[in-house]
UniProtKB/Swiss-Prot annotation:
Keyword set, alphabetical order: Acyltransferase, Repeat, Transferase
SUPFAM superfamilies in the record: Acyl-CoA N-acyltransferases (Nat) (SSF55729)
Highest classification ranks of the organism: Bacteria, Bacillati, Actinomycetota, Actinomycetes, Mycobacteriales
Protein name in the entry: Mycothiol acetyltransferase
Residues annotated to bind acetyl-CoA 2: 242-244, 249-255, 288-293
Swiss-Prot/TrEMBL catalytic activity: 1D-myo-inositol 2-(L-cysteinylamino)-2-deoxy-alpha-D-glucopyranoside + acetyl-CoA = mycothiol + CoA + H(+)
Coiled-coil intervals, chain numbering: none
Homology family: Belongs to the acetyltransferase family. MshD subfamily.
Pfam families: Acetyltransf_1
Amino acid sequence: MTAADWRRTLNPQEQREVRELVGAATEFDAVAPVGEQVLRELGHDRTEHLLIRGSVSGGAADAVVGYLNLTPPRDAQPQMAELVVHPRARRRGIGSALARAALAKTGAANRFWAHGTLEPARATAAALGLSPVRELMQMRRSLRDLPDSVPAVPGVRIRTYAGLADDAELLRVNNAAFAYHPEQGGWTDVELAERRAEPWFDPAGLFLAFGDDDSDRPGRLLGFHWTKVHLDQPGLGEVYVVGVDPCAQGRGLGQALTAVGIEWLARRLGAGDSAADPTVMLYVEADNVAAVRTYQRLGFTTYSVDTAYAVPPAAN
């Protein structure tokens, strides 16, 4: 790659080729090379795209063999890059070329996600002088043998999502709970609408906890648990997002909401069927010790780790 051809938009053919590239890498590595938000951005002009075309061993001579997505600057958060190289076009320096292009564009200020922290990603990071700066753990547990009862929280009632009328409170709590978070914080109606449009969205799997006693304003949202059923992976559910208003923390609300959602996923995915073996997954920041311990108490164990790499501050 002699010059980086950054693009704000991709045409439908290019979007299709990138999705096929991601699918090929996912099948080969048994882990998706980019997050779901990258795929969501393919049809928009909110991020920047970088494509590398070339030959695929035993395949097309002019295929998209490398792709990188770069988020725009946002508040004080570093830009994030995610990239993928076709399994049959690796060991040609494509990944390094994409990464160097991103570093050149951002003045070496961006980060790179390495999903699954696979050996090729670790080797590329080392060759570029990048160091781990953030770890995101994926934890899983079986949906069998769940606790018999969900812990109740006094003065709180939990119901499912009732539609657009819930959105203002949902956004308020989400943005208060994740004010620090580079991906989950700062949501608007756009982010909610995009997720409602996803094939997996089910209002019956979005649980909202409201204050229902004198200590809280009735009707005020205290927390929520958004679950997800992975339609492309039968038997897999996800604790997609659990958010609790900082004013309501310390009451066991997060654990109660998590348990309610997991119980629903177990019913939804047929945990009572002797032939089924459903599983629930979640993501948690590795340095969030309290949350990790909470999930461990709920029976979750570490399944994989995603690592964000960056140029060390002294070298930047």
